[in-house]
Amino acid sequence: MSVRFSSTSRRLGSCGGTGSVRLSSGGAGFGAGNTCGVPGIGSGFSCAFGGSSSAGGYGGGLGGGSASCAAFTGNEHGLLSGNEKVTMQNLNDRLASYLENVRALEEANADLEQKIKGWYEKFGPGSCRGLDHDYSRYFPIIDELKNQIISATTSNAHVVLQNDNARLTADDFRLKFENELALHQSVEADINGLRRVLDELTLCRTDLEIQLETLSEELAYLKKNHEEEMKALQCAAGGNVNVEMNAAPGVDLTVLLNNMRAEYEALAEQNRRDAEAWFNEKSASLQQQISDDAGATTSARNELIEMKRTLQTLEIELQSLLATKHSLECSLTETESNYCAQLAQIQAQIGALEEQLHQVRTETEGQKLEYEQLLDIKVHLEKEIETYCLLIDGEDGSCSKSKGYGGPGNQTKDSSKTTIVKTVVEEIDPRGKVLSSRVHTVEEKSTKVNNKNEQRVSS
């Protein structure tokens, strides 16, 4: 007898002269065969004794023999009688129940194979990797939309930067206008001050002119009086009246008027020179002050323009850095959200795969327990079959192996057979990656002495 474990074979049962047992990773099956020295008698356990029937039961002779077990057991006056018949019936019933279990396990094995096949088709490496829907056709659209969003964000940042530059330029022009307006108002204030000084000088000149006219009128009036007096004196001197008076000498009016005129002219000239000197002094000091103020204003204006340029450059750099920072923050937020979504999706897939793996392991453990139970049943049945053969040997006296019906007599052969089966069990995730690998070695030794089989299985 040989025991074969295979990770790829999913067949149930095999026939041969020595019998065989084949197990798959998804289920279990059992077949056993043996021969008995009684010609025409054969029995199959998932395989016929010495035949190829996998249906079980009693029937099929060795090498085409025609005697059946049913006929053998049906003969009340045959080799077996009494308790031996009951034993045979009990064995037959137990064998039938065992075959029913084998068929049920075969159906369960096929069902598990279909489930595993469907699971691999659904969650295997070529599938959607555990997703209920295939979104791969949307990936190019998503990438294109991401590129459009990035391009729009960049364009928006450029527009914002240009807007900020235009605003800063407008602020610069506004500051320049305010400075020019302040300078214009200062110059106008200076002009108004000079106009007031000019008005004062004009008033002073007018006053002097009025004084000059008054003095001229007074001089004309004095000249007129002098002429009248001269005429009166000349008329009085034209007669023959001699009047001698002893009086003080008279005042010379001409000399007096000349002296007065000279005094007033000197006073007017002095006033004119004083006014001109004061005006020149005030004008010089004012011109010097205006020149100094203009130089200071020009220097301050140049310094202010330079400071404004520096401020504008720094503000432009600040706005550019702020826009870059905002863009990087948006990119970072978007990247974090994308990776969080992907991480959540991967965690969900891992949870689903772990649950499925746990379910598969549970089912595998159940199948393993069923296989161990069936193996115990097999060993027990082999013992009962051996007892059955001993019973038959007790009735018949010998056991022999016959290659054909009506062949030669009893033959004695000693043969031994050793079968070593290595099974590689690999755990593969849905992506096709090997998680773990185990190697099971099964050694089977079969020895035949006088057509009696002795099987030993070691692993």
Swiss-Prot record:
Biological process, per Gene Ontology: epithelial cell differentiation; hair follicle morphogenesis; intermediate filament organization
Protein's recorded name: Keratin, type I cytoskeletal 27
Organism: Homo sapiens
Region entry Coil 1A, spans: 84-119
Subcellular location: Cytoplasm
Stretches the record annotates as Head: 1-83
Chief site of localization: cytoplasm
Assigned protein family: Belongs to the intermediate filament family.
Location of the region described as Coil 2 in the Swiss-Prot/TrEMBL record: 257-395
Positions of the UniProt region annotated as Tail: 396-459
Note: There are two types of cytoskeletal and microfibrillar keratin: I (acidic; 40-55 kDa) and II (neutral to basic; 56-70 kDa).
Tissue and organ expression note: Strongly expressed in skin and scalp. In the hair follicle, expressed in Henle layer, Huxley layer and in the inner root sheath cuticle of the hair follicle. Expression extends from the bulb region up to the point of differentiation into the three layers. Also present in the medulla of beard hair (at protein level).
Function: Essential for the proper assembly of type I and type II keratin protein complexes and formation of keratin intermediate filaments in the inner root sheath (irs).
A Pfam entry, by short name: Filament
Span list, region Linker 1: 120-141
Keywords: Coiled coil, Cytoplasm, Intermediate filament, Keratin
GO terms, molecular function: structural molecule activity
Complexes and interactors: Heterotetramer of two type I and two type II keratins. Interacts with KRT6A to form filaments.
Coil 1B as annotated region, ranges: 142-233
Residue ranges of the region described as Linker 12: 234-256
Every IF rod domain range: 84-399
